[in-house]
Amino acid sequence: MTQENIPVQPGTLDGERGLPTVNENGSGRTRKVLLFLFVVGFIVVLLLLLVFHMRGNAENNHHSDKTMVQTSTVPMRTFKLPPPPPPAPPEPPAPPPAPAMPIAEPAAAALSLPPLPDDTPAKDDVLDKSASALMVVTKSSGDTNAQTAGDTVVQTTNARIQALLDSQKNTKQDAGSLGTLLHGTQTDARMASLLRNRDFLLAKGSIINCALQTRLDSTVPGMAACVVTRNMYSDNGKVLLIERGSTISGEYDANVKQGMARIYVLWTRVKTPNGVVIDLDSPGADPLGGAGLPGYIDSHFWKRFGGALMLSTIETLGRYATQKVGGGGSNQINLNTGGGESTSNLASTALKDTINIPPTLYKNQGEEIGIYIARDLDFSSVYDVKPK
């Protein structure tokens, strides 16, 4: 270093005490301490790693030695195949068959004789189902016994079933009112199906409108007829099955009783203008679908009570006339005195004979009625559909 590069120091006097510098000495000492601590820590870590490594090697060596000792104690096994079996000696030739000797007839008869009673072989235990009700019994000497046994089995089975039902019923009753309410009615399931060929099907539940051709009189059974007033189409509404003007025939019975205002008519067959005929077997109804045909009811009141009323009136007038003639100037009339028992008996007899006259229903021709279709009607056997 030249003197030119030396900085100019401020002037000092000899013997003057200056300020000490502590920055350079302090920083160098701190660096030395940190370096020393780092070296010591690094050495300690290396020593720890060396110790752990040596301990792991020692454990592995110990485990391998132990495994070798255990495996060496197992003896070695050798397997040898068994020697093959010696060959079988050759079979000796079969002797020639002996000639068949004929059996004498007496010997054969002796063989076919049945065994003695004492030597009867014991029968095997076989399940006998002849007493079952499902077995077919032929007409023989044992018919009565088989039938009796079958009836006994059936009665026993029925008794067991009834006892089971009674026990279930008693169990429900013993459960109390709440237990009874918790058991609902058991119903069977039903399977759904599809209607076939709805183009030619008049479904059950349809109503045919019809006008009477004949007058109905329930005095005696009779026949009836009506004319269809409205076209009837198939279930899908595409094909005309019963044309307007078709004739329907039916029948009715004289079964009107006191208090009844309708008559039951069964319509049996329909005939279309094209000659198509089909059986209906469906009941008649009113235009709204009510069961039976309503009509005018004649209760025959005067026929039932007219004779008795006339006899009672004649008896009363006769008593009045008799009392008037023989009573003098008295103004009182007693209708309950005097004879006339024979006339009273006649009135009772007349009433007894006429009281049971049934009422009569009348329904005139031309009145509108309905027919409830009670079954599916299939016209596929007479009709067909052609594409346009």
Swiss-Prot record:
Native source species: Brucella abortus (strain 2308)
Main location: membrane
Function: The virB operon is essential for intracellular survival and is not involved in the invasion process. Constitutes a major determinant of virulence in mice. Virb10 seems to be per se essential for intracellular multiplication within non-professional phagocytes and is essential for pathogenesis in mice.
Listed GO CC annotations: plasma membrane
Keyword Transferase assigned: no
Stated family: Belongs to the TrbI/VirB10 family.
Keywords carried by this UniProt record: Cell membrane, Membrane, Transmembrane, Transmembrane helix, Virulence
Annotated region (Disordered), positions in chain: 1-26, 79-102
Annotated compartments: Cell membrane
Miscellaneous comment: Transcription is turned on at the beginning of the stationary phase of vegetative growth.
Residues annotated as transmembrane: 33-53
Gene3D superfamilies tied to this protein: Type IV secretion system, VirB10/TraB/TrbI
Keyword Coiled coil recorded: no
Lineage start: Bacteria, Pseudomonadati, Pseudomonadota, Alphaproteobacteria, Hyphomicrobiales
Pro residues bias spans: 81-100
Membrane topology recorded in Swiss-Prot or TrEMBL: Single-pass membrane protein
Protein name: Type IV secretion system protein virB10
